[in-house]
């Protein structure tokens, strides 16, 4: 990794930490991050020319794999007509129609430029719509870096939240309640204490930022019931799960209808795009139809919209999501079987084409506390072994993995063979 090491050293001169998003710095696992030069199908290629089987997939959106030729050509064609207009286009109307067709709960939607913009705007809308200030989120869920969301639980279950980053005033954090994921009783208790104050619940319907943790039976329905009872807005943050765990997202997989949904770069074919949308009567409160302000010069960018249309029209292919789910199950269960056979405690979670590997003897990880108690030393050793042998996983034990349509059965089996070799080394070191 000689060239990557040189680039990383050079990057730290003018880029804080040498990266433009913290997890890329490899602080959680140690070592030097490979600097990527190109990507194609299931593969990444670093600056030193090494090929990796990629299970990060740009943190989720590359459902079709990298450098999809139809998306690439759509971008080229759109770019020939100009890169940005700052004006309405037919493409943004067409993609809004298509998203609404595929995710029926999104009766109206607004394009933005990132998942953070989507969640930030959805929360502002929920507050404006309900005329309430408090929001409820869950420990271990990540919804972007907006001030109101970088908040952790206080000293007691129902105490005011406290900032999880410097630069966030305590006055902002006090309006955020943080509950335990998959614990509906804590949510009910919060609403009983603040029945007229909570504007919304925001939740990852499948948590993807404490590794991959699906909802336990009844959890999402419980959130729907509580919001209905107290007049709060239920927001599904489907930035990771949208068009990933099912064609209609997690809400289709689990048959729960939220009031608002947030989507990320998956609807831009991997380009910088986001969207939020939902019930018509709520969305009509957004400017210029209503009083809740939201805007963006680059929102609905014509090149990104072209990429998104090319992507969404392909993921409609019958059978795609069944194939993705089967490949993901084969991979996750295969790695678990190898680990357990070598005497390494491991459990796995998966939902659609998202998966999580947990070095723990807990049979099924369902919350943040269980996730953070996993064996990070074993994970880090496993991570570097896989990386050295050409498999690129997320460089932190708290991040989900993703399978794409380009991960063929042969590539899955190749990955399992590499995992067997690496896990044998883990067993030897920690046995």
Swiss-Prot record:
Pfam families: Aminotran_3. GO terms for cellular component: cytoplasm. Disulfide bonds: none annotated. Its main location: cytoplasm. Its cofactor is pyridoxal 5'-phosphate. HAMAP family: HemL_aminotrans_3 (MF_00375). NCBIfam families: hemL, PRK00062.1. Homodimer. This is Glutamate-1-semialdehyde 2,1-aminomutase. The gene is hemL.
